[in-house]
């Protein structure tokens, strides 16, 4: 797992973003603008990005120099440091290298609020009229709480608890709608040698914990918790959250922590597919990510997905909506053309390309843009996953608020990564909570905005 960029390096990068970088236009000598686009290559594949860039050039005449890589930070980090930043970057938060988070903290992103008011190239609607409600009103897209949007929402994916629907049908088990029902099911599964829970890596606890906050205390508790409000971790809602996390750790497969890393996380995902564990937190990308592994299964298997259970009977279950982000570096040389490219990402043409491009392995890309009406165009597993909000679950969005850089303190290290130790038994829930309280005091004192 890559180390987070040192603060010294970040400082150098920030200087590179602003020092001597007056806007310029890159051209090929004949007046034609060329922008540099850098996109992380994930399970969605790189082919879709090539096609979107081609479609953008055909529509606008602006050429695109595309870079895709599974370790994109290794490429663009030095570029940003050397005052040669790409014009558009698709790189979400939550990556081990933490590059996007570091640039947020360093005020290294270009304001995209103007893009929302732009007409989508080749269409008549504005970008703001295409994007589904709520996606540009979160702390992910508006990290500074200043009413401005700095990151464009991309490739949304409802997150929840994934399970083997065939196993539940064979056992006659009902998917729990409350945590009490979850614990009861955990005992039944334990009696048959099946763990109740596993997780790919502790980082997957982000969407899980956000949805849990909503299910316990709604938006009010979520907002206070994610802004590190004084005394929030001593409230009854927080105590309920920590009790659930502690109890769930005891129901988690014992091999999970050792395999919860970038090399072995698929082994934890296979636990659910091979009936060694019932549930895992994940997103809709899991189907494509494990498509080849599914072909090798010897047991009956079909994907199932449910929201996190309600705390009490009759309460609401929540499914966190994860989405990736695209952004324009503050040091980009072609901001006007870059803004056109970002606007084009929400065109009907781009939406179709992202969703239905054939990858190198023969599967479809399946990247869903957060635009209105997209669920009506889906079928199969995706129809099931993206209709979760039509089946009673409520949507949870947002994340921990950005704060100024603090040595050795970030939200992943404080809230998510310690789950491995909690499951392994090397960290008690009391120690976990105490560490959160200490770190939250620092985060609150250094909040941005």
Language-model regions, residue ranges each:
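Extracytoplasmic/periplasmic substrate-recognition and gating elements
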Residues: 54, 58, 63, 81-82, ...
């Amino acid at each position: 797992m890559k180390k987070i960029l040192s603060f010294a390096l970040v400082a150098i990068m920030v200087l590179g973003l602003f020092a001597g970088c007056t806007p310029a236009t890159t051209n090929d000598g004949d007046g034609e603008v060329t922008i540099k686009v850098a996109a992380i290559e994930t399970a969605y594949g790189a082919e879709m990005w090539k096609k979107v860039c081609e479609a953008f050039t055909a529509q606008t005449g602006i050429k695109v120099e595309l870079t895709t890589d599974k370790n994109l930070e290794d490429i663009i980090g030095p570029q940003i440091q050397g005052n040669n930043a790409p014009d558009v970057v698709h790189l979400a938060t939550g990556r081990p290298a933490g590059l996007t988070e570091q640039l947020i903290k360093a005020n290294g992103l270009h304001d995209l609020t103007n893009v929302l008011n732009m007409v989508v190239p080749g269409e008549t609607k504005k970008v703001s009229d295409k994007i589904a409600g709520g996606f540009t009103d979160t702390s992910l897209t508006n990290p500074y709480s200043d009413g401005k949007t700095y990151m464009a929402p991309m490739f949304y994916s409802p997150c929840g608890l994934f399970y083997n629907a065939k196993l539940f049908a064979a056992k006659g088990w009902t998917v729990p709608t409350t945590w009490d029902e979850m614990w009861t099911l955990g005992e039944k599964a334990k009696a048959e040698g099946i763990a109740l829970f596993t997780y790919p890596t502790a980082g997957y606890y982000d969407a899980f914990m956000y949805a849990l906050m909503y299910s316990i205390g709604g938006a009010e508790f979520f907002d206070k918790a994610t802004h590190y409000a004084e005394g929030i971790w001593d409230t009854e809602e927080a105590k309920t959250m920590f009790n659930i996390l502690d109890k769930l750790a005891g129901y988690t497969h014992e091999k999970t922590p050792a395999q919860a890393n970038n090399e072995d996380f698929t082994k934890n995902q296979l636990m659910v597919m091979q009936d060694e564990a019932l549930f895992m937190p994940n997103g809709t990308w899991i189907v494509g990510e494990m498509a080849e592994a599914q072909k090798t299964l010897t047991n009956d298997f079909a994907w199932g997905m449910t929201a996190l259970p309600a705390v009490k009977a009759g309460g609401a279950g929540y499914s966190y909506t994860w989405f990736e982000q695209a952004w324009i570096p503050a040091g980009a040389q072609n901001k006007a053309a870059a803004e056109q490219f970002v606007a084009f990402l929400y065109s009907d043409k781009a939406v179709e390309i992202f969703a239905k491009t054939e990858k190198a392995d023969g599967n479809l890309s399946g990247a869903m843009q957060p635009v209105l009406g997209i669920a009506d165009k889906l079928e199969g597993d995706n129809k099931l996953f993206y209709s979760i909000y039509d089946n009673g679950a409520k949507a949870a969005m947002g994340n921990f608020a950005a704060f100024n850089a603090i040595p050795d303190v970030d939200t992943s290290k404080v809230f998510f990564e310690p789950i491995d130790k909690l499951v392994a038994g090397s960290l008690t829930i009391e120690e976990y909570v105490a560490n959160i309280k200490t770190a939250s005091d620092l985060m609150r004192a250094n909040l941005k905005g």
